[in-house]
Amino acid sequence: MYTFLALAPILVVLVLLVILRLPAKISMGVAYLVTALLALFVWQASGAQVAAATVNGIIVALTLLFIVFGAILLLNTLKEGGAIVAIRKGFMDISPDRRIQVIIVAWLFCSMVEGSSGFGTPSAIGAPLLLALGFPAMASVMAVLIIQSTPVSFGAVGTPVLLGVWTGINDKPDITQAIAPLSTENYLLQIAGNIGLIHALVGFLIPLLLSGFLTRFFGKNRSFVEGLKVWPFAIFAGLCFTVPYYLVAKYLGPEFPSLVGGFVGLMIVLPLAKRGFLMPKETFDFAPRAKWDEDWLGSLPEERFDDSIAPRFSLVRAFSPYLIVIGLLILTRVIAPLKAFLTGNLTTIEFTNLFGTTISSKIQLAYSPGTILIIASLICILLFKMNGQAVKRSWSSSATTMVAAAPALLLSVPMVQVFINSGSAAEVVNSLPAMPILLAESAAGAFQNAWPLVSPWIGAMGAFIAGSNTVSNMMFAYFQWSTASQIGLDANLAAQVVALQAVGGAAGNMIAVHNVVAACAVVGLMDKEGYVIRKTLVAMTYYAIQAGLIGMGIIFGQIWWWILAVIWPIAFFGIMAMTSKKAVA
């Protein structure tokens, strides 16, 4: 019974948001009430615990809104300054094919952004950029969410592994004994290599899947097959990222795989794409905007382009704000003294032990990607010689969009925090663990030796709930290791199970509710979150199943698991192809 009750908040979100497609501000409001009532009256969490989790959620939501504001401000500033015209022309010169553009921008560029910053920054930068290139708002959001899978485990310079997995496995006597004489630090590097391998084996097909989803849901013909026609370029772009990504993860550690993979991929793919290497014979474009479904459109004003008019700026100058953002993100994350200052006491507002609980929260605006996006926007004023009216329009419209996004985030994140912190109060007899832990324990009891097949789904559940691969790994890394040990796996194979947790947690970012809400907000796509999740849930399902099959093959060494790992992508792409020419979901 408790397992079903623990599942209730997730079911409420799925039914209201995904199936009934109600706005997130309504769905998450109901989910928050259900979660809070269960925590108080069934789990018997203290009122102070629920209140502290709620306040922490509000603080996190406000920091996300700050990033949303910065992302929209940069887009609006580029529009008002005239730089978008040059950026659009630059990408059109590389290829006018939307399938090629989405692979370059979402898969390669946003993966590099994920490697430098993470925590939703790829959506904040990539979705507005695709929108500016003429993509429907919903297509822009779908694309940047689907790629938040392979690069996520090593996002923010390896934070999901260095902080998330490390917190789960460090100072655990049973792990220390099992891995001796290996140190925990070296064991973490082993896990990082495992993560890189599984992601690489699954992720190299993501550009092809992305192209198929683009044509299936947003093409004139609603044809998944139309997206598959770029398979040589898509697989090439997939390998250009995943090969250096895996090599860095295996031999250098978890800090730079996504950053290096994205950068190397761009350096190889961009010049070759401009020369027409592996380009499809037919160019894919969207139907005229007048024929787009209303659900695809955001609230941001439509941009009209006359490609016969020469841009006012060179592509390098127009794109330089994005280069500034990437540069500042890398500097503030990699240079230790600078990072220490930006996250130190002088620049941090901290709320410790809220309402007498162990829950604490902090605000680090100086370290926030939102601040970097605002700095880049201010530089644009000088760079593009903007007048006062243009600056005023960009700031006011950005503030309006942020305010419209606020209700959904201010309800989504507190619901998540209450769910995570729902464990029974210390004085309660027959206390219950927090809801996500109880769900994971129930799954472990049910699946036993098939656990590697299920392991990615636990990671995905953690990310879906928490909106973070890092938090998912913190919650479940030790649980995954313990479960692996209980079914008789040695330390080396248990490291593979922990890797599957991290891989699933990365894939779960595609459907994490407040990630989706924030991504929709930066393109003005309000109240359409459920429509987006219906699409990204399909991609996440593909990723988690494939990771589980590969995990079973690695851990148990049976050839038929590897055969299934080959059959599953073929079957998935075949099923998607058979759904062509049907109404958009």
PLM region descriptions:
Residues 22, 79-83, 96-97, 130-140, ...:
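Juxtamembrane helix-boundary/capping and inter-helix hinge elements in multi-pass membrane proteins
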Residues 51-134, 141-142, 386-483, 487:
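Membrane-embedded alpha-helical segments and adjacent helix-loop junctions characteristic
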Residues 1-6, 204-353, 527-531, 545, ...:
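Long, contiguous bundles of hydrophobic transmembrane helices that form the permeation core
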Residues 99-111, 137-150, 163, 177-207, ...:
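Alpha-helical transmembrane segments of multi-pass membrane proteins
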Residues 8-19, 31-41, 68-73, 110, ...:
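Hydrophobic core segments of alpha-helical transmembrane domains in multi-pass membrane transport
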Residues 1-73, 77, 85-90, 307-311, ...:
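Hydrophobic transmembrane alpha-helices of multi-pass solute/ion transporters
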